[in-house]
Structures are given as structure tokens and as C-alpha cells.
Amino acid sequence: CCPTFGGSGVVATELGISLSKRGHEIHFVTYKQPVRLEYLSNNIRYHEVLVPEYPLFHYQPYELALSSKLVTVVKNHKIDVLHVHYAIPHAYAGFMAQQMLAEDGISLPMMTTLHGTDITLVGSHSFYKPAVNFSINRSDVVTSVSESLKKDTLNIFDIKKDIKVVPNFIDIANLSQSFEDCQR
């Protein structure tokens, strides 16, 4: 996920925390600890993606570093499923990780959750559109955070996969009394 306050970072982090409370082991793999991930525990781990500076590259290849880190984490922790949030670069790097793992006889299903600007802004740009289209179609499962985004995705890209809508969520148990006071 993107480790920021944006939708992909928040949804991915909250989903991971919820799954960890149900006993699942969760691994976040990104360039910075997600802002909503306040604590790590035995079943919540963060793996930093480091991108070494190399003067040959004008732009450092984050996708290569991410896909390599995913392979390492999968092998070291026996990951069952890869759930990537935000089509580019995460679904693309996830696909590359799947291919590298397949070389070692490891099959890993990948789920891609689409969040919005990865489709309507960044993804639809002519430079990225072929890679986004490819990555979505190579995902084993594709979800969208809204029906509207699903429709946009199907209109912008040539998607062969079924896209399931799983709406963003708000855990009302986390809302404080001060929120209710503001409503008066």
C-alpha cells in the first residue's frame, strides 16, 4: 500500500489490523511504515523497501526493489496470499514477485484492490495505462472500493477480470464522543 493518509494506506492498514485481531499474521511491505499503523506485534510486521541510490538511474527503480522485497518476505515468512493496494506500482510489482517465486516452485495468489486515482488519474495516463491494464488482468482477484470506481475501471481499461466491489468502511466503534458533540 501507499503508507500515507490516502485511501489505499488507510484501508490497507485498517484491514490488516482487523485481520490481525482475528489471528492472521499480517506483513506490510512498503517504503515507510503506514501512518495508521501505530504498533507492531507478533502478528503485525512492517518490512521497509529500501531503494539504493545508483547514479546510472535518473529515477531509482522502486518497482524492482518492491518486487524483490516481496519475494524475500514471502520466502522468509511463508506468506499465503499477496494483497496489494493501488494498481501502480503495487500490482505490477506483485506480478513480478509472483513470476520470480514461480521460478522456485512457489505459487502465490494475488488480490489487487483499486482505490481511485490509481485508475482515474495515474493509471489512465498513456505512459502507465498498458502496465495498469496488464497488472489488473494478471491479478487473481480484483476488488474496487466503490461501484463508481468499478465502472470507471471498466470504461478506461480492457479488463477481463471480474471486479468485486468491497466498499470503504468506517469502524464506528472507533469514533469518539467528541464526534457526537460536534453533531449538536
Predicted features and spans:
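A short, histidine- and acid-enriched strand-loop-helix "catalytic/donor-clamping" loop
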Residues: 100, 106-125, 141
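Membrane-proximal helix-turn-helix segments that form the acceptor-binding/catalytic region
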Residues: 125-144
